[in-house]
């Protein structure tokens, strides 16, 4: 997680009410200057890393620090060489998986929509760098088609082009598909072009060409 940039960059902006001490994600307050719970003022915005840290083994020192995975994609990248050496796939190809992920959310809410432990499905699709725009468009169209195929009302789904300053540290372009939930418009799923960031970072950290 250090190599992937999650230790230093997987964070959300946090503010704390100076009166009731409740904490909120600053980017979800819609510009509010007062606490929605008690009307108190907020302290300074600070970055809050969402990874759960723990220690492996009997000693609690820096060498034993470990993290619960905040996304499932990391396992695909660190096993990329094994996949290529075993199956010899030709570009483009994809790897899909489902599994548990854990995030130390600032404010879990809305039943199971935002929780600290959840099941996540991800697909990593590998293409040549010169072909990413075409592939991105195809996946975006396919994700829209999937929405209709499973019976979701297309009028309730909206595409959000995530601006540069709000994208994840690994992404060159991100489109979020947002759904009109009873509690507001929130992300349903997303599409991101991660470039070769992950493979290059893990290759550099491990000294193994992926």
What are these regions (language model features)?
Residues 1-210:
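TRNA-recognition modules of translation machinery and tRNA-sensing kinases, especially anticodon-binding
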């Amino acid at each position: 997680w250090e190599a992937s940039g999650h230790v230093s960059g997987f964070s959300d902006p946090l503010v704390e009410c100076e009166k009731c001490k409740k904490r909120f994600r600053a980017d979800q307050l819609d510009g509010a200057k007062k606490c929605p719970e008690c009307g108190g003022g907020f302290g300074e915005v600070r970055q809050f890393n969402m990874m759960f840290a723990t220690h492996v083994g009997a000693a609690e020192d820096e060498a034993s620090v470990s993290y619960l995975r905040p996304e499932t994609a990391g396992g695909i990248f660190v096993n990329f060489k094994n996949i290529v050496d075993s199956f010899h796939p030709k570009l483009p190809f994809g790897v899909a998986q489902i599994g548990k992920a854990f995030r130390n959310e600032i404010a879990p809410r809305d039943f199971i929509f935002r929780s600290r432990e959840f099941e996540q499905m991800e697909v990593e699709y590998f293409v040549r760098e010169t072909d990413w725009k075409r592939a991105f468009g195809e996946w975006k169209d396919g994700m829209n088609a999937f929405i209709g195929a499973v019976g979701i009302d297309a009028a309730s789904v909206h595409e959000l082009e995530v601006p540069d300053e709000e994208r994840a540290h690994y992404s060159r372009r991100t489109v979020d598909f947002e759904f009109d939930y009873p509690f507001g418009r929130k992300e349903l799923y997303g599409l991101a072009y991660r470039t070769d960031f992950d493979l290059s970072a893990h290759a550099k950290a491990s000294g193994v060409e992926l």
